[in-house]
C-alpha cells in the first residue's frame, strides 16, 4: 500500500547489547571461554523490562529504517505469535518488527520485542528456517537473557551497561560516534561478555528448537540455517567487527543438529504467505536493491502450486514497481480472479489502481472484500484509496475506528492526519500527528502539537479536555522514561 522508511540506525549496536545476533562470529581460538553460569535476572522486574522495552521501541521507530509495510508486519507478527503460543515462561506481550537491512541479523530486547532484518527473507530457503531464527530470539526473551546479563555486569562492571545503553542512543543521532562510544565501553569487558553470550546462544538454540517443533515446523531448519551462516562466515574476507562478540563455534552447530536428530522427522511445506512475503520483501525492500531475481522466480515457476502463484505475484509486483501498470494488471488478474479475497493480491491490485488514478475501482474492490473478511491491512488500503479518491470523510470514519483499536500503528495515525487536514480539522490533524511523534519517542514535539490542538479547540469542549488529558499522560511517560534518557 505505502512504505514509510525512516532514518538509519546502527541496529547492530542494539543486537550486540541484546545478545540476540543470529549471524556467525569470527573469533580466534582464545575466544572459547569457560562457562560463567547464569544469574537469576533479579536486576529488573517484568514491569521494568516492559517499560524499558517501550522506551527503546519508540527510539527504534523514530530512528531505524523500519519496514512499516502492513502486509509484511502482519505476516511476521502472525508467524511470531504462532511460535510464542508454543513457548514456555512467556511473561510479556510480544511484538515483531522488520528493519530494511541487507545484513543477516535479528535481535531481541526488553519487553518481548523482536527485530528481524529484511535480509533474512533472502537467506531463508523456507518458512521453517525463518521460524527457527524467530524461535531463537523468542527464547532469548523468555529466558530473560538481557536481564540476566545486566545482573552479571552489575557485579563485574556496573558502569558497562549504562554506557552501552547510552551509546545506543548516541548512535541513533550519530552512528560513527555511537559505534566509537560502544567500542570503548565494551573493550574492558569483552572476554566476559563473549563467554556469557555463548552460553545464552546455546540455551536459545536448545529452547528455540523445542518451540519450533511444538509449533509444527521442521526442527532440522535450525541446524540447517546455522550451517548456512557458518559456511558464509568461512568464505567471507571482511567480517563485521560486531560479530566478534557472537561466536558460532562448531560445537553450537553440532549441539543443534544432535537435538534436531532426536526429534521425529517431519516434512513441512512453507505457507503461501511465506512465499508472498519473501517476494514482497525482496522486490520492494532490501536496502533499495531489488533482489527478486529472475532465477528465483523461474525456480518457483517450476515448483509447487504455492511457489508458482508466488512467482506470478512477484512478476506482477516487479511490473508495478517499474510503473508498468498494464503489464502488472494483466499478470495479476488470473490470481485475483481465482482468489478475490487474497490480501496480497488485493493490496497489489489497489496499488495498480491508484497508480493509474483509478481510485474508485480500488474503493469498490476493497469494500467488497472487506465485507467478506475484515482485515486491518485492507482497512488501511481502503482508507488510503478514499483519500486518493478525494473522499476524506469516508477515510476519517475508517481511521477513527482503526486508530482506536490499533493505537501503536503509525500508519493509521499518519493517514488520519492526512484525512483531517483535507477536512480542515486543524486541531484533530495536530492531535493525530502528535500520536505519530509519541510513537517515535518525540514526546516534546507531541506535547507541543497537542498544546496547539487544545488552543484551537473550543474552550471547555470535550475535545479540548481530551487533548489536555493526553498531554498529562505524555508528561507522565516522560517522567517514567527519564532514567533511560540520562544513560
Swiss-Prot record:
Q: Where is the active site?
A: 137, 205 (proton donor)
Query: What cofactors are annotated for this protein?
Result: Zn(2+)
Q: Which GO terms describe its biological process?
A: chaperone-mediated protein folding; proteolysis involved in protein catabolic process
Give residue ranges of the TPR repeats: 309-342, 427-460
- One function term, GO molecular function aspect: zinc ion binding
Q: Which SUPFAM superfamilies match?
A: TPR-like
**Any Pfam family the entry gives:** Peptidase_M48
Residue positions binding Zn(2+): 136, 140, 201
| Its EC number(s) | 3.4.-.-
CC cofactor note: Binds 1 zinc ion per subunit.
Where is it localised?
Answer: Periplasm
GO CC entries? membrane; periplasmic space
Q: Which residues form the signal peptide?
A: 1-27
Q: Which UniProt keywords apply?
A: Hydrolase, Metal-binding, Metalloprotease, Periplasm, Protease, Repeat, Signal, TPR repeat, Zinc
Fetch the CDD domains from UniProt: M48C_bepA_like
Please name the top-level EC class of this enzyme.
Answer: hydrolase
Source organism superkingdom: Bacteria
The role this protein plays is:
Functions both as a chaperone and a metalloprotease. Maintains the integrity of the outer membrane by promoting either the assembly or the elimination of outer membrane proteins, depending on their folding state.
Q: Which HAMAP family match?
A: Protease_BepA
The name of this protein is: Beta-barrel assembly-enhancing protease
Amino acid at each position: 500500500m505505502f512504505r514509510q522508511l525512516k532514518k538509519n540506525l546502527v541496529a547492530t549496536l542494539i543486537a550486540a547489547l541484546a545478545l540476540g545476533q543470529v549471524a556467525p562470529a569470527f573469533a580466534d581460538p582464545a575466544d572459547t571461554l569457560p562457562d560463567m553460569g547464569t544469574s537469576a535476572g533479579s536486576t529488573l522486574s517484568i514491569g521494568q523490562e516492559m517499560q524499558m522495552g517501550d522506551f527503546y521501541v519508540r527510539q527504534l521507530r523514530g530512528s531505524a529504517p523500519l519496514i512499516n509495510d502492513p502486509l509484511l508486519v502482519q505476516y511476521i507478527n502472525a508467524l511470531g505469535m504462532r511460535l510464542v503460543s508454543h513457548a514456555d515462561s512467556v511473561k510479556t506481550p510480544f511484538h515483531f518488527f522488520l528493519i530494511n537491512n541487507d545484513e543477516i541479523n535479528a535481535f531481541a530486547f526488553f519487553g518481548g520485542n523482536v527485530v528481524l532484518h529484511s535480509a533474512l527473507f533472502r537467506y531463508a530457503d523456507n518458512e521453517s528456517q525463518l521460524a527457527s531464527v524467530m524461535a531463537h530470539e523468542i527464547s532469548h526473551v523468555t529466558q530473560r537473557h538481557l536481564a540476566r546479563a545486566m545482573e552479571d555486569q552489575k557485579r563485574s562492571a556496573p558502569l558497562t551497561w549504562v554506557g552501552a545503553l547510552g551509546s545506543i542512543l548516541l548512535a541513533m543521532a550519530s552512528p560513527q560516534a555511537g559505534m566509537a562510544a560502544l567500542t570503548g565501553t565494551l573493550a574492558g569487558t569483552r572476554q566476559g561478555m563473549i563467554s556469557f553470550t555463548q552460553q545464552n546462544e546455546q540455551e536459545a538454540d536448545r529452547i528455540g528448537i523445542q518451540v519450533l517443533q511444538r509449533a509444527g515446523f521442521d526442527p532440522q531448519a535450525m541446524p540447517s540455517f546455522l550451517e548456512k551462516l557458518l559456511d558464509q562466515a568461512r568464505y567471507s574476507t571482511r567480517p563485521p567487527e560486531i560479530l566478534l562478540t557472537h561466536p558460532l563455534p562448531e560445537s553450537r552447530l553440532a549441539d543443534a543438529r544432535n537435538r534436531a536428530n532426536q526429534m521425529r522427522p517431519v516434512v513441512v511445506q512453507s505457507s503461501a504467505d511465506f512465499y508472498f512475503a519473501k517476494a514482497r520483501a525482496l522486490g520492494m525492500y532490501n536496502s533499495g536493491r531489488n533482489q527478486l531475481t529472475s532465477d528465483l522466480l523461474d525456480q518457483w515457476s517450476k515448483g509447487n502450486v504455492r511457489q508458482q502463484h508466488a512467482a506470478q505475484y512477484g512478476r506482477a509486483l516487479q511490473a508495478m514497481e517499474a510503473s508498468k501498470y498494464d503489464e502488472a494488471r494483466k499478470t495479476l488478474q488470473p490470481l485475483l480472479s481465482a482468489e478475490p479475497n487474497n490480501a496480497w493480491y488485493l493490496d497489489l491490485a489497489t496499488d495498480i489502481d491508484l497508480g493509474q488514478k483509478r481510485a474508485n475501482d480500488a474503493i469498490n474492490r476493497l469494500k467488497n472484500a472487506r465485507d467478506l473478511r475484515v482485515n486491518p491491512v485492507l482497512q488501511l488500503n481502503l482508507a488510503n484509496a478514499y483519500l486518493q479518491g478525494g473522499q476524506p470523510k469516508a477515510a476519517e470514519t475508517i481511521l477513527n475506528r482503526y486508530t482506536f483499536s490499533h493505537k501503536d500503528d503509525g500508519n493509521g495515525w499518519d493517514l488520519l492526519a492526512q484525512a483531517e487536514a483535507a477536512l480542515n480539522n486543524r486541531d484533530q490533524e495536530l492531535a493525530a500527528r502528535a500520536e505519530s511523534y509519541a510513537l517515535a519517542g518525540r514526546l516534546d514535539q507531541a506535547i507541543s502539537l497537542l498544546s496547539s490542538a487544545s488552543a484551537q479547540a473550543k474552550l471547555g469542549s470535550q475535545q479540548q479536555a481530551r487533548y489536555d488529558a493526553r498531554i498529562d499522560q505524555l508528561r507522565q511517560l516522560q517522567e517514567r522514561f527519564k532514567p533511560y534518557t540520562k544513560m
